[in-house]
């Protein structure tokens, strides 16, 4: 595989269609149901670049020689580039969400922010709001973690 997506279950993904239509290269979906399979896949390093989806955005970080500061802050890598056998980990959600905020004039400086939910984009949203100077950030969740200050 040269380019593709790894994750536990990929039936929901439109990544193959999007990448092949817009970029003109083959993009493979590679379901890896177990962490053991992910570790073996990363050890082989037989890819040029991959995207990573749940539940492996944290475990892949162990295999990266370099991790982008945004990915470190979010504690999740969703893109890995193989450069001569060294794996470089990035999180494209952070710049993507930042771009959307800029495009729509969303300001965070000295504001109070409410984030609804603790799903996949929570940490990204929180990090962008924090980095852009939010005064306070609250999270409301159906499954709160009181240690993180989350509420129902």
Kindly label every feature range from the protein language model.
Residues 126, 130:
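Gly/Ala-rich phosphate-binding loop of Rossmann-like dinucleotide-binding domains
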Residues 132-150:
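NAD(P)-binding Rossmann-fold cofactor-contacting core
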